[in-house]
From Swiss-Prot:
Keywords, comma-separated and alphabetical: Electron transport, Heme, Iron, Membrane, Metal-binding, Photosynthesis, Signal, Thylakoid, Transmembrane, Transmembrane helix, Transport
Signal peptide: 1-23
Function: Component of the cytochrome b6-f complex, which mediates electron transfer between photosystem II (PSII) and photosystem I (PSI), cyclic electron flow around PSI, and state transitions.
Protein's membrane topology: Single-pass membrane protein
Protein name: Cytochrome f
Length: 310
């Protein structure tokens, strides 16, 4: 039921976005929810890369170690030139949106809001978090949200406590992070978007360029054997060919309008046993005390030697 409500809510957001802001540029992390059981393939690739083909830098900052039942911040950085705009679905220039996915280790989850500090509340204003699925609460999605306001996305994370969950152990864990800016080049259905390069469907000469539906252009290539093959270029990408041009199969016939891209990385966090920390502090205290005692003893001996005239 929860998954159904989540899907319905996501669909409602999409519908409202489409009808209220048709010129917007979206980066939909939740599309992966509808098409993949897991956001990470066996090869390690995060599935967002199947639609967002361009590679762009994504960075992440997490603490080196955390204590059980503590809240910490995982920060995903999605840098890009905010002065750049991209093609919307209607061919107009629109600001980029961003999205991110953080795959936490089992047991780590989004921190409940009553555990958020004032700093975290301020840093996450306007950001909405979604679990990937009911059985994967450790995978958290964000987006689409305005990129010019959220080049850094803060994920408040609650560390598990092995004292209350026997399936959790102290030690080092991997975190998988993905960050995207802008629209994809391929829809989940496999169809190209208008935010990509279109290529010649065959070798031959361009015999016609005719207007299509919704501002599209239909490019016809006549091959050497007389066959005519068409390629429909949607509104947005600029044509690089004219009637009479000779093209090779697979050669670009439009520019590349994409200015966004996806990036992923792996990082690590240590779930630290507080007993080890207390033991280490006790050891350091013992060493410091021993050094102090040695210094005091040395001075005492020096005083005795001075009194005896040695």
């Amino acid at each position: 039921m929860r998954r159904l409500l989540s899907s319905t809510f996501a669909a409602l957001i999409v519908g409202l976005a489409v009808f209220s802001a048709p010129a917007a540029s979206w980066a939909y992390p939740f599309w992966a929810q509808q098409n993949y059981d897991s956001p990470r393939e066996a090869t390690g690739k995060i599935v967002c890369a199947n639609c967002h083909l361009a590679q762009k830098l994504t960075q992440a900052e997490v603490p080196q170690s955390v204590l059980p039942d503590s809240v910490f911040k995982a920060v995903v950085k999605i840098p890009y030139d905010t002065g750049v705009q991209e093609l919307g679905a209607d061919g107009s220039q629109v600001p980029l949106q961003v999205g991110a996915v953080v795959m936490l280790p089992d047991g780590f989850t989004l921190a409940p809001q009553d555990r958020w500090t004032d700093e975290i509340k301020e840093e996450t204003e306007g950001v909405y978090f979604t679990e990937y699925s009911d059985d994967q609460p450790n995978v958290i999605l964000v987006g689409p949200i305005p990129g010019d306001e959220h080049q850094e996305i803060v994920f408040p994370v609650l560390a598990p406590d092995p004292a209350t969950d026997s399936s959790i152990s102290f030690g080092k864990y991997s975190i998988h992070v993905g960050g995207n800016r802008g629209r994809g080049q391929v829809y989940p259905t496999g169809e190209k978007s208008n935010n990509t390069v279109y290529t010649a469907p065959a070798s031959g000469s361009v015999s016609a360029i005719e207007p299509g539906d919704n501002g599209a252009s239909v490019v016809t290539v006549k091959s050497a054997d007389g066959a005519e093959i068409t390629e429909t270029v949607p509104v947005g990408p600029a044509l690089l060919v004219s009637v009479g041009d000779v093209v090779e199969a697979g050669a670009p016939i439009t520019d590349d309008p994409n200015v966004g891209g996806f990036g992923q990385l792996d990082t690590e966090v240590v779930l630290q046993n507080p007993v080890r920390i207390y033991g280490m502090l006790a050891f350091f205290a013992a060493v410091a005390l021993a050094q102090i005692m040695l210094v005091l003893k040395k001075r005492q001996i020096e005083k005795v030697q001075a009194a005896e005239g040695v």
